[in-house]
Amino acid sequence: MTFKPFLNPEDIAVIQTEEKNSDKKQKRTPEQIEAIYTFGNNVLVSASAGSGKTFVMVERILDKLLRGVPIDSLFISTFTVKAAGELKERLEKKINESLKSAESDDLKQFLTQQLVGIQTADIGTMDAFTQKIVNQYGYTLGISPIFRILQDKNEQDVIKNEVYADLFSDYMTGKNAASFIKLVKNFSGNRKDSKAFREMVYKVYAFSQSTDNPKRWMQTVFLKGAQTYTDFEAIPDQEVSSLLNVMQTTANQLRDLTDQEDYKQLTAKGVPTANYKKHLKIIENLVHWSQDFNLLYGKKGLTNLARDITNVIPSGNDVTVAGVKYPIFKQLHNRIVGLKHLEVIFKYQGESLFLLELLQSFVLDFSEQYLQEKIQENAFEFSDIAHFAIQILEENHDIRQLYQDKYHEVMVDEYQDNNHTQERMLELLSNGHNRFMVGDIKQSIYRFRQADPQIFNDKYKAYQDNPSQGKLIILKENFRSQSEVLDSTNSVFTHLMDEEVGDILYDESHQLKAGSPRQQERHPNNKTQVLLLDTDEDDIDDSDSQQYDISPAEAKLVAKEIIRLHKEENVPFQDITLLVSSRTRNDGILQTFDRYGIPLVTDGGEQNYLKSVEVMVMLDTLRSIDNPLNDYALVALLRSPMFGFNEDDLTRIAIQDVKMAFYHKVKLSYHKEGHHSDLITPELSSKIDHFMKTFQTWRDFAKWHSLYDLIWKIYNDRFYYDYVGALPKAEQRQANLYALALRANQFEKTGFKGLSRFIRMIDKVLENENDLADVEVALPQNAVNLMTIHKSKGLEFKYVFILNIDKKFSMVDITSPLILSRNQGIGIKYVADMRHELEEEILPAVKVSMETLPYQLNKRELRLATLSEQMRLLYVAMTRAEKKLYLVGKASQTKWADHYDLVSENNHLPLASRETFVTFQDWLLAVHETYKKQELFYDINFVSLEELTDHHIGMVNPSLPFNPDNKVENRQSEDIVRAISVLESVEQINQTYKAAIELPTVRTPSQVKKIYEPILDIEGVDVMETITKTSVDFKLPDFSTSKKQDPAALGSAVHELMQRIEMSSHVKMEDIQKALTEVNAETSVKAAIQIEKINYFFQETSLGKYIQEEVEHLHREAPFAMLKEDPESGEKFVVRGIIDGYLLLENRIILFDYKTDKFVNPLELKERYQGQMALYAEALKKSYEIEKIDKYLILLGGKQLEVVKMD
């Protein structure tokens, strides 16, 4: 059939005009139309937040299909598996719509084919695609197609550590042993182990793996900075310019301060103050030295300049005016600290080069040996697979040409988050002029995953400067947010983001613009709010504030506004989302919202199970039972709702003895033998008596019963399970408690017994700052959402609260003794031996850690990259809101304004200040104060602690107190009493006819075993229950060093393999290998199948050989059904299952079954499966009326294959 031709620029212009003049309610923008139809060259679409980039991508793909391009001729890379699934769903919907409107049968047929082809088309992550290439063409590198992915970090660490240890030993005894020891000590200091050095090696290795060719990067770039920056003349010009800029900025800021009336006050004699004159002199010197730098100093005089600056400016960072401190000199101090000692640094820096060459050799050797170990294991990391794929395409022109010819277009979503490995893959798949890239550098927030926004930026600039290389299309219309959100976002980033910090100039071409008239409507009440807790830090006595990312007081501030929105503006809770920077340590928010009755659901893998209040109470209860001398746990138990001791009660108990453990004090109080027994009131005595009796009962019970039974006894004795059911989020709380009992049960089933071991396991999890997975329950529909900013990317919410904007950015990487740069290589802190600089009798040994020049340059590059990423993170967070945006932090109302009053530079905050600021709040307040004469579209509101009382905050659904000791109160409803009576009667009937009630019509062998284990000893296949039960995954953490294989998955794969082997008179190893490739199982599962044993079975065993001889009588994977009678109730039921295989001969049947169970003694398995094989034999007898059945087990789980004949 003939398809429509692709459009030229004139055709596209016509469509743009028609769209503009149409009466569509939602019109496509000219830029969207251009992005959909442009053809014949590379296209980069810079799509701002909410601009419809997914819409554009789907429409472009659909247009390709309608013009005759098959779906399998498109390569479409997405950032996540989820994004790929959503893209496929949208495509299916659009194709179905096109099918309905298609006029020709040929087109309908073609579109139907594309609809079918979506699931097998190359639409997915780059990881998935590179695996596909290596599976198919890995043989060119000697890589087996049956490899598995090393996803378990423990397994990776075991292999890495073994390789490292062997290599470390070789270097310690090699020809450069003395230098190597010096290298190790440079990073490990006086530590006796080499752990710090090992971490540096792993850091370099991981960084190199993010490049498109790790070995080449290590050989050509790793030492580049160390070999280049060896003297003053090598210092980059931009570093000098940056220093001079900081000097001028400092002078300008100081001049602004001297102009303040408060500062210019004269002394009593009418002359300027000493400080005033001193600061005027500093201004004069900084301006003079910066303007005449080349004449006065030049690069060789940088050390002298740094010393001159040090001599004239104060040693501290701040200048105080009218009681307010201004950090005027902070940035300047930071910039000159390394320059002051450059002469000394250059003197010793050369010594470090040989050590770095040694480190280079070590990492290269480590990389190669680690790779060889993985090849031996046939298990690889994702980065290995990606590099194999690149190597395959680079070294095999025919394979590369195959893909380049195949793909009409190479498309990529979220291009700003590409790394260099992915970029190289896209280059190899493209023919040079058929790439389509969609992204937004302002939303590049995955640097921790080695994403490099400069890849996008380089394309952006190249296409902007030279359109022949590719077409740049900018989508800036936002179809998500109201004008209040767009205006505030623009007002912040117009003054904040440029190429220095943020990696792109936020000019008019990037400013967000409302895409529809509806969004342009003004809603003054929805103006963006910066809500700040008014505090001088010392005002808050939040002992918990360091424990959480957001303090309880800030959480109250948020709760108050949410309750106001809900009650006064009728905003549903589900329309509100809280965004945080981290997915951990948000307990303060959870607890505060619980307190005020605000429903809250967390998203994105929040793991706070062990930190939930109800679980913490139970863990402390178990700790106390295990060891009553654990004061912390015991006091927590007494204070908990289970026993309700208050502070006064605990104080009276505590003073019964000064030195004893608290449990002994409780016993003294119980027997009234303490130092102050007169303080034990009758009411308190009754409480203690009840506690002691209950507690001792629990301790006695724990000695002879399982953990599961103990936990449920605690729940029932103190009605604790019922108690949490009366609290907010009752379903979640009860599910957590239920999960604790099941997890304890699973723990004991693993072979570990006892309360002490269980507690140690839990404590180990907590010590490692880990947690157990949260229990999933049916989440409330109308609840506030809590998620990380990263998780929110691509989503939209009506009301957004960005929390904890006063939290400092993490700069931990900048303090590392080793900093890496993709372009300049390594920079280190070098520990120099400077004892020759001083007289030996004064200091016999002097070692100084100095920041080498490459380190200083890399440090500044890393700092700017970190600040740029944080700025983009703030942009992502602010652009999630549809209606209203809140930003929440804390600051001092009396001090903040002057602190952030800066001098604008090119309509931006000064670069020096932007580099100094380390919180979102710093940026927001500085913009607000510096540009206060402009309309900024966001307000700053301070809230005092006095406004955050319970009375001011309010409550959503206040709950009544629950008394666990009052059984009448807990069962107060007559209806409940009657219901319980009826249920008890029903339960009696249920117990009487339990067997018949629980018996389903159809059973499998394993279910028969479950109910009638005393009668039969069998084990079979799948379990079918008649009553559907909610099943929750209560997995305990795996502390083993290697990933365990799922026995069920392995068993299923072996059975499928045995079914797929093409049977003949002579089964060969090639037949088994071929069948294995067809098995539908994970690569790791297939790799675990020991096909050598299967080959041995066919080649060496009598049964295996006989099966091959009688292949025409062979039946495999044969289903059966058989009627049985329940011996207890007389009810009839059907047993159903699948027999692995049997030979149907003239007068007998040979029945065999494969087992992958681990075993030492085969007789154990013979006994275990006696019942199952008997059932299978009975079914075959009834089916064929043949009495003689020979039964065999083929055991694959031992060191050697065993064939066991059953009785």
Swiss-Prot record:
Keywords: ATP-binding, DNA damage, DNA repair, DNA-binding, Exonuclease, Helicase, Hydrolase, Isomerase, Nuclease, Nucleotide-binding. ATP binds at A47, S48, A49, G50, S51, G52, K53, T54. One of its GO terms (biological process) is double-strand break repair via homologous recombination. Its EC number is 3.1.-.-, 5.6.2.4. It comes from the Bacteria. It catalyses: Couples ATP hydrolysis with the unwinding of duplex DNA by translocating in the 3'-5' direction; ATP + H2O = ADP + phosphate + H(+). CDD domains: DEXQc_UvrD. PROSITE patterns: UVRD_HELICASE_ATP_BIND, UVRD_HELICASE_CTER. One of its GO terms (cellular component) is DNA helicase complex. Pfam families: PDDEXK_1 (PF12705), UvrD-helicase (PF00580), UvrD_C (PF13361). Gene3D superfamilies: 3.90.320.10, P-loop containing nucleotide triphosphate hydrolases, PCRA, domain 4. Residues 26-482 form the UvrD-like helicase ATP-binding domain. Its cofactor is Mg(2+). InterPro entries: AddA (IPR014152), DNA_helicase_UvrD-like_C (IPR014017), DNA_helicase_UvrD/REP (IPR000212), P-loop_NTPase (IPR027417), PDDEXK-like_dom_sf (IPR011604), PDDEXK_AddAB-type (IPR038726), Restrct_endonuc-II-like (IPR011335), UvrD-like_ATP-bd (IPR014016). Residues 508-794 form the UvrD-like helicase C-terminal domain. GO terms for molecular function: 3'-5' DNA helicase activity; 3'-5' exonuclease activity; ATP binding; ATP hydrolysis activity; double-stranded DNA binding. The heterodimer acts as both an ATP-dependent DNA helicase and an ATP-dependent, dual-direction single-stranded exonuclease. Recognizes the chi site generating a DNA molecule suitable for the initiation of homologous recombination. The AddA nuclease domain is required for chi fragment generation; this subunit has the helicase and 3' -> 5' nuclease activities. Heterodimer of AddA and AddB/RexB. PANTHER family: ATP-DEPENDENT HELICASE_NUCLEASE SUBUNIT A, UVRD / RECB / PCRA DNA HELICASE FAMILY MEMBER. Belongs to the helicase family. AddA subfamily. This is ATP-dependent helicase/nuclease subunit A. It comes from Streptococcus agalactiae serotype V (strain ATCC BAA-611 / 2603 V/R). The lineage of its organism: Bacteria, Bacillati, Bacillota, Bacilli, Lactobacillales.
